[in-house]
């Protein structure tokens, strides 16, 4: 268990250096460039919107408009691609750095601080494909709990395990995400995911990026399907147009390129994310547009 615990600890403690730059349309004219951006370190195992209040507090002095709500109407973008708030930060990063990857190779040189640059935008109407954020922090928490209910149902055939948590444990579970308490979080999560006699299915999501959007698939992953139940067999079944012989695409989990021969059950056990799902990002070492049909 030592290696397993170390891998889990590393994924939980993984951080990203993020630069948030205001859309020029939101900025008071004449503001110096350094005042329209802020830098922060964000846990890979979190949601981007959890950090919106901090970002807006840092930048409110250069905004044309008053910040009436630290959540509603605000959204992140990267090179004209919507960055969804409702996926783990690390998964978004792993998926989106597949855009024009050759141009980004220089960012990963030794002794270089890699910064993920995002644009902060505002619009009254929700972007196509986005989940409207109208309920602030409570909506984020409710959404996260719903993900765990889904994951629990997939594993057990019901949501009894998570619904049976005491009120204090249920509150503590979310607080662990905010306060970064891995030990207590894992203890509660294991009570939800553990199943005697094996799982009914595995909660898995596959994230595939094009130059226009982030596409997410949620396949039904039952033990014993595709022969031995390997990652490669799943990807060839779900994305046959992408994973033919000689494909340059690579599956990445928590920033780690994983072997197609890996057993899905093992990957879930090691790399289940903070929302109860195993998130697989499809990345490419060369620039290309992934088919969407």
Swiss-Prot record:
A Gene Ontology molecular function term of the record: Atg8-family ligase activity
Keyword ATP-binding assigned: no
Cellular component aspect of the GO annotation: Atg12-Atg5-Atg16 complex; autophagosome; cytosol; phagophore; phagophore assembly site membrane; vacuole-isolation membrane contact site
GO aspect biological process, one term: cytoplasm to vacuole targeting by the Cvt pathway
Protein name (database record): Autophagy protein 5
Recorded topology in the membrane: Peripheral membrane protein
Membrane-traversing stretches: none
InterPro entries xrefs: Atg5, ATG5_HBR, Atg5_HR, ATG5_UblA, Atg5_UblA_dom_sf, ATG5_UblB
Subunit structure: Conjugated with ATG12.
Top-level taxon: Eukaryota
Sequence position, cross-link Glycyl lysine isopeptide (Lys-Gly) (interchain with G-Cter in ATG12): 149
């Amino acid at each position: 268990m030592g290696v397993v615990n170390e891998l889990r600890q590393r994924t939980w403690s993984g951080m990203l250096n993020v630069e948030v730059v205001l859309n020029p349309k939101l900025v008071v004219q004449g503001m110096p460039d350094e005042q329209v951006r802020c830098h922060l370190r964000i846990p890979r195992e979190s949601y981007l919107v959890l950090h919106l209040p901090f970002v807006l507090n840092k930048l409110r002095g250069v905004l044309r408009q008053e910040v009436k709500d630290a959540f509603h109407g605000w959204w992140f973008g990267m090179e004209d691609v919507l960055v969804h708030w409702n996926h783990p930060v690390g998964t978004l990063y792993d998926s989106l750095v597949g855009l024009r990857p050759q141009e980004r190779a220089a960012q990963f040189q030794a002794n270089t601080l890699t910064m993920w640059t995002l644009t902060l935008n505002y619009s009254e109407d929700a972007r196509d494909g986005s989940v409207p954020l109208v309920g602030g922090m409570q909506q984020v928490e409710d959404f996260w709990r719903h993900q765990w209910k889904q994951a629990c149902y997939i594993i057990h055939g019901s949501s009894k395990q998570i619904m049976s948590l005491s009120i204090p444990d249920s509150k503590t579970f979310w607080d662990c995400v905010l306060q970064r308490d891995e030990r207590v979080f894992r203890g509660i999560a294991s009570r939800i995911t553990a199943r005697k006699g094996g799982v009914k299915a595995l909660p898995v999501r596959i994230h595939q990026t094009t130059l226009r959007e982030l596409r997410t698939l949620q396949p039904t992953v039952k033990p014993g399907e595709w022969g031995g139940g390997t990652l490669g067999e799943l990807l060839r079944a779900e994305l046959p147009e992408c994973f033919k012989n000689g494909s340059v695409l690579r599956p990445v989990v928590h920033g780690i390129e994983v072997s197609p021969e890996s057993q899905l059950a093992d990957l879930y056990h090691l790399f289940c994310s903070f929302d109860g799902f195993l998130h697989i990002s499809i990345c490419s070492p060369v620039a290309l547009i992934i088919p969407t049909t």
